[in-house]
Amino acid sequence: MAHRCLLLWGRGACRPRGMPPMLLPGGRTGSTERLYLRMLYRYATTQAKTSRNSLLTDVIAAYQRLCSRPPKGFEKYFPNGKNGKKTSEPKEVMGEKKEPKPAAAPRPSGGGVGGGGKRGGKKDDSHWWSRFQKGDIPWDDKEFKMYFLWTALFWGGFLFYFLFKSSGREITWKDFANNYLSKGVVDRLEVVNKRFVRVTFTPGKTPVDGQYVWFNIGSVDTFERNLETLQQELGIEGENRVPVVYIAESDGSFLLSMLPTVLIIAFLLYTIRRGPAGIGRTGRGMGGLFSVGETTAKVLKDEIDVKFKDVAGCEEAKLEIMEFVNFLKNPKQYQDLGAKIPKGAILTGPPGTGKTLLAKATAGEANVPFITVSGSEFLEMFVGVGPARVRDLFALARKNAPCILFIDEIDAVGRKRGRGNFGGQSEQENTLNQLLVEMDGFNTTTNVVILAGTNRPDILDPALMRPGRFDRQIFIGPPDIKGRASIFKVHLRPLKLDSTLEKEKLARKLASLTPGFSGADVANVCNEAALIAARHLSDSINQKHFEQAIERVIGGLEKKTQVLQPEEKKTVAYHEAGHAVAGWYLEHADPLLKVSIIPRGKGLGYAQYLPREQYLYTREQLLDRMCMTLGGRVSEEIFFGRITTGAQDDLRKVTQSAYAQIVQFGMNEKVGQISFDLPRQGDMVLEKPYSEATARLIDDEVRILINDAYKRTVALLTEKKADVEKVALLLLEKEVLDKNDMVELLGPRPFAEKSTYEEFVEGTGSLDEDTSLPEGLKDWNREREGSEEPSGEKVTSPVQGAGPA
């Protein structure tokens, strides 16, 4: 274009208005100017011819420039790509500064087609395809919705085309010969796929309905012979004969026939991925059948809201766990003294005492990766999955070290070996062997603390429990009265209490009313109280609601609508009165709180006592308890001269107590100072640890002990028969009696008893639990910069409510 303008300018046709003549050296004009313009014109003409001849060269150069740009996602394979080394850098011209390029705005992780991330790269777990591979249909993803919509439109249009397309009208060979060929309306015949013939009509002679017609043929040879014969019969000769064209068409019906197969394969793939090995995966690997050997453990980082301030009643266990975290955060504190960091600890104790809750609190405050897995997740239907998952679990732990690994319900995989050689037992033993090797073998795991929880430590393999694997065994038993008070304080925080109630006093009172309760029972009591208050549309929770909740947890649901015959109700009243009076006049019996003849749970009556916080029992104390338990059966016999089935539970308790005294506690002179383990309920007993003669002696002594207790109870209630009758009659009238009613009927109890929180904790040094921390654990979940801690710094203990910094 520049050359053309220069040519026109040289010819004088393109001189702009007002433009002065071209200045020449020396400022000369005239003839010299004309000569200069002729030379310039000659040069421009030569350049224009050259440019016209090199048009193909320019196109090729432009194509090469286009191809020099690497495809998107393959930049690193090209030397001048943005990820590769640049072979030639544009040199900076002297005196010319490069302007800094504006920084590219960061792409959102989920934006753009492709789901975020480069093509060919590994998609993150939030990508819709990764979620779809795990069996999760990502309806909330816009890209997935777009693909789904286009796929649905494609298949919908495909089906619409095949369902509603014009299929023509089928005719027979006879109709074709008589109605079409004989009338001369056929232009040509199209043999489609050698299966049928489509009739094409002569222009202007199309049938009224506008549909084409077709007819089936058996074979091409037969069709050609019949057509030849028919045209000869009709006298169609030479050029008038109908031409036959052979064509092959694909109507797409094969796609429709493949649709059921595709759907079945898709369903099978989805089922495999959502099968036993694919459910509950954590996003590591493909999932499904090809990753059954991968661990299903979860790595928790800042995902748990439970803190140590939410765990109470097990302060000693909390200190142990804090120390394990301190091992990981500040190992130099122990290594300077030559100490080795313990490998792990196992939390044991009855159900509901807070083992898993303590592990959750550790995950919430440890400030190190916390890996959790259940013992049952190691065992699957495939052989060899258990050991493979153990290896993968510890590989994951080493990758995240320092970290804490928690195996919940480890008894599922850690049972004692050598109990039969069944298939499942062999797989469990292989898994246990791999676990033993990973915990303390040649490939020793460093900076990984292993915690485990179980309520069946007696069935665990001894090799698993030895030091070097689980160095510490932390027993978490039912909380004492101080522990229950602390637990009640935790669970009373979110509750809307009556304004007249003080949380401190209420927690202590409830702790004194719930002896033997675990932490889970205490939480259940608080929740039941809130439910009872909501049931009655109360604005807040009062003390009566808590008392009803305790009765609900101990005795079961109150059945006020259950109909009892008058005779049955009278029997129940005298039965419960026998219990109450026997316990009232026996020194070592538990104090009575309430007695009721309203049916609860499985029982027709209910008596609530207040057991002492006691760990050692004498023979006399156990005998008084047996007599109190037999008071109901004795009362029935004294007042009615007959016995009923209502004492079944009482007799079971008495029998268990008698066997425990003789077999376990060595409290019988004839059997001697021996102790045998009593079988647990549900255990299969193949042989007894004592002879038949000893078994017979034990049975005889148990029977004698129970008979002595029964005779003693008969003598007591016969003496106090009038008191039993008073209590029974008042029960029939009021249905529920408390301690004050008993005092009015029988007078004060002749023995001293404790009933308040202060009386129970008297002599223990303090009213509350000791939650102070040792000096070395003040900053248990923080890394120390120096080796020495400033002695004057005061750090609030996490036990008292402070979270991590």
UniProtKB/Swiss-Prot annotation:
GO biological process terms held by the UniProt record: axonogenesis; calcium import into the mitochondrion; cellular response to glutathione; mitochondrial calcium ion homeostasis; mitochondrial protein processing; mitochondrial protein quality control; protein autoprocessing; protein catabolic process
Gene Ontology MF: a single term: metallopeptidase activity
UniProt keyword annotations, A-Z: ATP-binding, Hydrolase, Membrane, Metal-binding, Metalloprotease, Mitochondrion, Mitochondrion inner membrane, Nucleotide-binding, Protease, Transit peptide, Transmembrane, Transmembrane helix, Zinc
Catalytic residues, chain numbering: E576
Transmembrane spans: 144-164, 252-272
Catalytic activity, as annotated: ATP + H2O = ADP + phosphate + H(+)
The protein's required cofactors: Zn(2+)
Gly residues: compositionally biased ranges: 109-118
UniProt-listed CDD domains: RecA-like_FtsH (cd19501)
EC number per UniProt: 3.4.24.-, 3.6.-.-
Domain of life: Eukaryota
Keyword Heme found: no
Record note on cofactor: Binds 1 zinc ion per subunit.
Any single Gene Ontology cellular-component annotation: mitochondrial inner membrane
EC top class, as a word: hydrolase
Cell compartments where the protein resides: Mitochondrion inner membrane
Propiece residues: 40-67
Quaternary context: Homohexamer. Forms heterohexamers with SPG7. The m-AAA protease is either composed of homohexamers of AFG3L2 or heterohexamers of AFG3L2 and SPG7. Interacts with MAIP1. Interacts with DNAJC19. Interacts with PHB2.
Known role: Catalytic component of the m-AAA protease, a protease that plays a key role in proteostasis of inner mitochondrial membrane proteins, and which is essential for axonal and neuron development. AFG3L2 possesses both ATPase and protease activities: the ATPase activity is required to unfold substrates, threading them into the internal proteolytic cavity for hydrolysis into small peptide fragments. The m-AAA protease carries out protein quality control in the inner membrane of the mitochondria by mediating degradation of mistranslated or misfolded polypeptides.
Name of protein: Mitochondrial inner membrane m-AAA protease component AFG3L2
Record organism: Bos taurus
